[in-house]
């Protein structure tokens, strides 16, 4: 669309909107705190958006905004039977401070939309205002919100199939603006990059019913629990009866235009806050519709056995190896909630019932709002992993890098990076159901592996430079961390206050110290450790650290290592050696690897790719080293993101994020970003045959 045509369209929309606003003004009322509310008459509309599915390829066409998200389908007819009055604007800072005088959220002007309020805060405001005026104030239902937003339109926005010129704000490089739009000029619907951010309400034209900022400014909480749409006509829908997330609508400043569409849905934890999220209120009784039951559980949570098995313990002296077998099983060309393009950053845990549960994130773009968390279950006694199915996801939230941990008793833990916080959930029924998410700080990707020390402290590393570890001393009920306040110590290459590297797995050594290994991305960082993987040690619970290089090559992007304590294969219940799994070369060198020497029958072999090493002296030496491969003649195997690699006696999987657990049968369950390997200590110690010449 040309700039001239866009300008003509904008003028036409302003003229039409002006007529609608004039009609709405006659129906508006102002309440006791100066809030203008507009009466919305009953009616019907088409909720959601059908049509071509979004491909989410923001690197290719970040300006594209017209395709539908999977959770906006099917579009369905909704009838609103009763009139209601809704705020002409979002609740302002001045209005909210009559309820909470010390509230700090917002830009500071009385006419700014209030932000930094949780769904629970918004509900409390409505209850306060209801009591004050002896009338029912509440949040809009999701259906009421979209009905009011559309104001009789069926287009992508209430302004038509595009936003007017300079309607939307993205004035700072937050939300990856300059990654999506590296040029100085933004698409026509955005204000210039030089424009100053303003959260003032009523700064863009109202829709035909007199409502301002239904697209952008700040996003808005709705009353409903988030859940999938159902086909068929609905009357006064109230959403689901329960869920993990509350609905958020309208989009905010500093995000892609597609997230501002009338049909677009966002959802997140009701107790959390964001400086991009506020709310508007409805005056009127609750609709007389019915709530839908929660959606049926996904495949990974269906028919989960609750029996604690009597496991057959294989001989620890008999070498065992199996794999690789894919655990990421997704139909080709899937575009939500499962994605065929990028499946990465997995975690794995044994469940009390003997099942294996794997989780990972799935997306097109790793930074995209479409990113979802999926899971697959390998049921006890089954030979194959089940197809992937949704696990947990806040709509349009990049809830990144899930982790799993079993406490060895009844409880599974699920961790993830959220919007502005990390989250933790627990399950005591083998992952069939989970608690509501608990928000914890700091917000950061969690390292690769969670442990419980001999003192009973649950410990996990953090990728952020503002701390090193997050700890729980009460079994996961509460979490603490020691902040790093000296900026000179805030760097990922290691400091006296922080372990070296990111995605760091952690173990406790026999003398009580903590040990991590980490990934350093740049050559300059790697050079500090002689191009080797760094190890870090703490004798005071992660407050201070020392560092040294390991004997193993540095790894880089698309790679993550494992470090874990195995159980003894000779003394039941006793601690065994340390296991390290990593790669011989950085992923960029996968096609021309340097490789390493490995012991084999009659001497050594030179190989490259995924390997394992054992230390029997708490990380001082690593005498056992073996490529993780079944050997045999070279053949092609699928790896991460539809890539392929050659598997042979001297060649193993080259990149991937590794995760591992040792199951009660003594076997190590190792996964990459695509594949599942199983082996035991006896196999690791066994010398492989010399390669055939």
Predicted regions and their residues:
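Short, structured beta-strand segments at or near domain termini in extracellular proteins/domains
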Residues: 275-288
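Bacterial N-terminal signal peptides that target proteins for export
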Residues: 1-9
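Bacterial N-terminal signal peptides
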Residues: 8-18
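Asp-box/BNR beta-propeller blade signature and adjacent active/binding-site loops
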Residues: 293-693
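Functional-site microenvironments in short loops/helix caps that host divalent-cation chemistry
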Residues: 46, 51-68, 105-262
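A short glycine-rich, aromatic-capped structural motif
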Residues: 29-105, 118-120, 216
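Short proline/glycine-enriched turn/loop segments at secondary-structure junctions
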Residues: 236-240, 266-273, 601, 648-649
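Boundary at the C-terminal end of the N-terminal hydrophobic targeting segment
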Residues: 22-28
